[in-house]
A protein has these predicted regions:
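Gram-negative outer-membrane beta-barrel transporters
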Residues: 413, 476, 488, 576-580, ...
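C-terminal beta-signal and adjacent terminal beta-strands/loops
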Residues: 4, 619, 671-672, 694-752
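Transmembrane beta-barrel wall of Gram-negative outer-membrane proteins
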Residues: 243-277, 282-321, 345-362, 419, ...
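Short strand-turn segments of transmembrane beta-barrel domains in outer membranes
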Residues: 207-215, 225-259, 273, 559
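Short, acidic, small-residue-rich periplasmic hinge/interaction motif at the N-terminus
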Residues: 29, 41-45, 74-78, 88-129, ...
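Membrane-embedded beta-barrel scaffold of Gram-negative outer-membrane proteins
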Residues: 262, 356, 360, 366-384, ...
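Face-selective signature of the C-terminal outer-membrane beta-barrel domain
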Residues: 300, 304-314, 346-496, 520, ...
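Short acidic/polar hinge/loop motifs at secondary-structure boundaries
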Residues: 180-210, 228-229, 295, 547
Length: 752
């Protein structure tokens, strides 16, 4: 009886205590822009409680015993703030905090268990230490990702990642502010992703993940995905002028439209523009032109709602020297930077509108809505085989399309608590519709005469998806992320060359489950296991002839990795990974034919190291190995052409308090097979770049050098069968685009 009485008394006291608990809520702002700051780590010292600010910079702690608490707010490249607040019974203390910017201090960086499933620690460090200053660096910010340009700078880069020759985007999902970059059923190749509509100076953050493990990332996210986020506000207005070798000129300007008055109302708007011209280092002038114009508004229309509107337009036109065969250079027919068909080139444009709306309801539901629209035009002239098919007129082809793309992304998420466990549930829907007119493959001569139409048609492609994602934090150390998405595709192709003109369609769907585990031993060590299924869609010109069969090949992957700090000022991310892909049929855009592609298997190791050597000097290095093989083929004939087997990139970054900053970087890719039996080899290269800037409050002066040691290297390489005019028989060998020689560029920026 006495025990029952004591238990009853204890319950009464506990209930009374619970009835008089308090809380803390707050908003964190970027001091320079006065806009809310997301992903800030907020810790209640000594309690084990922590939170991460949401899209609106908000955080909340509930059920706190009345007392005095010490709060610590931290974010990469912002100065950590520590202060005290008193919690009283039945009240929620509300705080507004501004974080000032500061140099990155790796000693203050911790491995957070709150956002284990995001794993953006490395990317957050890189974007602060290695600001993106040219269009090629936009993609190179992703560890292990290599690119190659083989069309004079106007064409989308060829991408290599995790044992994939991704071509121009088939197996990596790229977005900008959530808007898709990859183009389905593109005239040149499936998943073609041209990022040149992004002004490098406006990139604020890059989120990425390798492998098919993220529930809200659908089509093309097999090798991985990357989302490039542009600035919501400019710190200052600026004008930048650059000039370099090979008749290279560039002008960039960004104007803050609302200024201090806008910041006081948590609003910002700017307009920015970029113009580039170069004749480049090839023997034949490239006459490359590019124009970008961007306008963006970001504002809090209510305390719990923000609206972001972005409009942009992009245009580019160029000539290029194409891919040249080894034998033409070795025989002296052309120089290393020469051309067989100097009339290759192209023109492209893209106009975008993007609206994003985020709100947090009184019950803490986070609702996101996004609508986007793009008008896109593309025309490319190429000649890969010279006179192989047509010994009189040559083999030049034209690939052309006009496209309207529109879509919607929406999600609703809520954090709930069951006992001491946290459950974040997200339900999302996505819709994308591509309407392409006049998608053409033609035989041309000198970019002036059409000799024959190989393919001509209209494409109507729809992708609708729904997904459910759950992040469960069972303890402060252990969390699980489980999700599933369903994607539905409907493809329609109208063949305008058919007699009579005919229209056919097909449809299919795919289910992609994900299951990820994270265990954070302490603020210096986290172990994770990622598993999941992803896919990439196939060209409509494959889907329709195949009747919707074998056109959504699944990719099954797993990563076992860890993030740890062996020393206070060192961060290491290491992972062993595996990926298996189903057989599929693919459309070869350069030939207009459908070919089978067999099963494939890849596995390898990734290692990324970030180390602060001194208060102002930082070192980074990435090492990536892969063993890509075709499944079901004989040993020795099962190589995957051009798939990278070893890559590495790294360097030193300097950030002096007096305004001097710079970097010295290298990138290396090893020899790799260029065909299935490795009898033709694509040679590797080691190239170094340098950048040096001196920045004060009103101006900046900079020098950048690509290929610092003037290495002669082949940026892209292909095993191609071709015939040069006058040759009796065709020859299969390496065809390449030369990489830049030593290339220096000076820049001056004025801030106001």
């Amino acid at each position: 009886m006495k025990k029952i009485t004591l238990l009853f008394s204890f319950l009464i006291v506990s209930l009374r205590a619970l009835a008089h608990l308090g809380g803390i809520s707050g908003v964190v702002y970027d001091q320079s822009t006065r806009l809310p700051l997301k992903d800030v780590t907020v810790q209640l010292s000594g309690t084990g409680k922590a939170a991460i600010t949401n899209e609106l910079g908000q955080y909340r702690f509930e059920d706190l015993v009345p007392a005095r608490y010490k709060i610590e707010l931290s974010h990469v490249s912002f100065r950590t703030q520590v202060f005290e607040v008193t919690v009283v019974s039945d009240e929620t203390a509300f705080l507004k905090t501004e974080l000032p910017t500061a140099n990155v201090e790796l000693g203050e960086v911790t491995v957070s268990s709150r956002r284990a499933h995001d794993q953006q620690l490395i990317s957050n460090l890189d974007i602060r230490l290695r600001p993106i200053t040219n269009s090629q660096e936009i993609l190179r910010i992703v560890p292990g990702l290599f690119i190659g340009q083989h069309a004079g700078g106007g064409k989308a880069e060829q991408i290599f990642l995790r044992g994939f020759d991704i071509d121009h985007g088939t197996d990596i999902r790229l977005t900008v502010d959530g808007m898709p970059v990859n183009m389905v059923s593109h005239a040149h190749g499936q998943g073609y992703a041209d990022l040149h509509f992004v002004i490098p100076e406006l990139v604020n953050a890059v989120d990425f993940k390798k492998g098919p493990y993220t529930t809200d990332k659908g089509n093309f996210s097999t090798a991985g995905w990357a989302d490039f986020r542009t600035k919501d506000a400019l710190d200052k207005s600026f004008v930048k002028l650059e000039a370099g070798q090979f008749d290279t000129y560039r002008a960039v300007a960004g104007i803050d439209l609302l200024g201090q008055k806008g910041r006081e109302k948590n609003q910002a708007a700017y307009i920015a523009s970029e113009y580039s011209f170069t004749n480049s280092y090839f023997d034949n002038p490239q006459n490359f032109n590019r124009l970008n114009v961007v306008g963006k508004y970001h504002g809090h229309i209510t305390p719990n709602t923000n609206l972001t509107l972005t409009g942009s337009t992009f245009w580019s036109k160029w000539n290029h020297s194409g891919q040249v065969p080894d034998r033409a250079v070795e025989s002296g027919l052309i120089g290393f930077y020469g051309s067989i068909d100097p009339t290759e080139g192209g023109e492209t444009s893209r106009t975008n509108f993007n609206a994003q709306f985020v709100t947090v309801t009184p019950r803490n539901f986070v609702i996101k809505n996004q609508v986007f629209y793009s008008n896109y035009n593309f025309e490319l002239y190429s000649n890969f085989t010279f006179f192989l098919e047509d010994s009189l007129n040559g083999d030049q082809i034209r690939q052309k399309e006009r496209r309207n793309l529109y879509g919607y992304n929406g999600s609703i998420s809520k954090e709930s608590f069951i006992g001491k466990s946290s459950w974040v549930t997200t339900l999302g829907v996505q819709y994308r519709h591509d309407l392409t007119r006049g998608t053409a493959l033609s035989h041309t001569q000198n970019r002036t005469e059409t000799l024959e139409q190989y393919k001509l048609g209209n494409i109507n492609e729809l992708n609708a998806s729904i997904y459910l994602d759950e992040v469960v934090r069972f303890t402060d150390r252990f969390s699980v992320n489980a999700g599933v998405r369903v994607d539905y595709f409907r493809d329609q192709y109208k063949d305008l060359l058919g007699q009579p003109v005919n229209k056919k369609h097909a449809s299919d769907a795919i289910v992609s489950p994900k299951l990820n585990f994270y265990y954070t031993f302490n603020p210096n060590l986290q172990l994770y296991l990622n598993t999941g299924k992803g896919f990439h869609s196939n060209d409509t010109r494959v889907v329709v002839p195949q009747g919707g069969k074998q056109i959504l090949p699944g990719a099954y992957g797993s990563d076992l990795g860890l993030i740890f700090k062996p020393f206070p000022k060192m961060v290491v991310n290491a992972a062993a990974w595996y990926l298996w892909m189903q057989q599929e049929f693919v459309y070869v855009g350069d030939a207009g034919v459908v070919e089978p592609s067999g099963k494939s298997r890849r596995h390898g190791l990734d290692l990324s190291v970030r180390y602060q050597l001194t208060k102002t000097l930082y070192a980074d290095a990435d090492f990536n190995t892969a063993k890509p093989r075709a499944v079901g083929e004989l040993d020795g004939a099962n190589y995957l052409p051009l798939a990278p087997v070893f890559t590495s990139a790294g360097g030193l970054s300097l950030q002096m308090p007096g305004g001097l900053n710079g970097s010295l970087r290298y990138r290396y890719i090893a020899n790799r097979p260029a065909n299935e039996d490795n009898s033709i080899v694509a040679k590797g290269y080691f190239v170094s770049d340098m950048q040096l800037n001196y920045t004060k409050s009103q101006y900046s002066v900079g020098l950048s050098v690509q290929n610092l040691f003037n290495t002669k290297w082949k940026e892209t390489q292909f095993a191609t069968e071709s015939r040069i005019k006058g040759e009796a028989e065709p020859v299969e060998e390496i065809h390449f685009t030369p990489g830049t020689p030593f290339f220096a560029k000076l820049g001056v920026t004025l801030f106001f």
